[in-house]
């Protein structure tokens, strides 16, 4: 009889634990999991895409915190690069960064062509100064290579053509968190049928049939911070020791120090 009472007591405790755990899970769903919080944090920026006319950013204000002076309208920075391993032990990285100062309504930056080496050799890096006027990239440095010159002058940032509404359908991603930094990452396997995947294959002549991985990274507070940053990467890499990806970020920082 004592055995049955003890068994009944154990079962009651077990049921109570399961109920409490279930309630905790429900609360997490209600409040939003870390995955959902990361997606919502990215949505604040990605919902602005596509930004066909980058000069529209002069009239848009991002997240402001105590780092901003009251009179400072801030600076938007948009960045896109295409990284590819063309040779073993080498990584070619090519793209553009543009800073749009809302105080002066001027946009300056550079186009970069960089080769990184794994053997400890210093990278080969070339930067070409640019500015933007009337939503058009103007090359400020002399470039003798006509093909490169046209590539720079006709360059389009990922954020100018990307429609990322499809990202909302992605769920159950691989999430990793470092609370000490803090930093947050989530990864999703994309579909080759996604319009943005088709667009990138066309623009960068990506021949691999492998479905890419979408990587979303946040450094800083999920609610927003002018100190941290958000980076989006679409990774087409076939193998661990090779690289084939497009990286994009759009940030809003104080213009005045």
From Swiss-Prot:
<keyword id="KW-0564">Palmitate</keyword>
<feature type="lipid moiety-binding region" description="N-palmitoyl cysteine">
    <location>
        <position position="23"/>
    </location>
</feature>
<protein>
    <recommendedName>
        <fullName>Uncharacterized lipoprotein SA0396</fullName>
    </recommendedName>
</protein>
<dbReference type="InterPro" id="IPR007595">
    <property type="entry name" value="Csa"/>
</dbReference>
<keyword id="KW-0472">Membrane</keyword>
<feature type="lipid moiety-binding region" description="S-diacylglycerol cysteine">
    <location>
        <position position="23"/>
    </location>
</feature>
<dbReference type="Pfam" id="PF04507">
    <property type="entry name" value="DUF576"/>
</dbReference>
<dbReference type="InterPro" id="IPR038641">
    <property type="entry name" value="Csa_sf"/>
</dbReference>
<keyword id="KW-0449">Lipoprotein</keyword>
<keyword id="KW-0732">Signal</keyword>
<keyword id="KW-1003">Cell membrane</keyword>
<feature type="signal peptide">
    <location>
        <begin position="1"/>
        <end position="22"/>
    </location>
</feature>
<comment type="similarity">
    <text>Belongs to the staphylococcal tandem lipoprotein family.</text>
</comment>
<dbReference type="GO" id="GO:0005886">
    <property type="term" value="C:plasma membrane"/>
</dbReference>
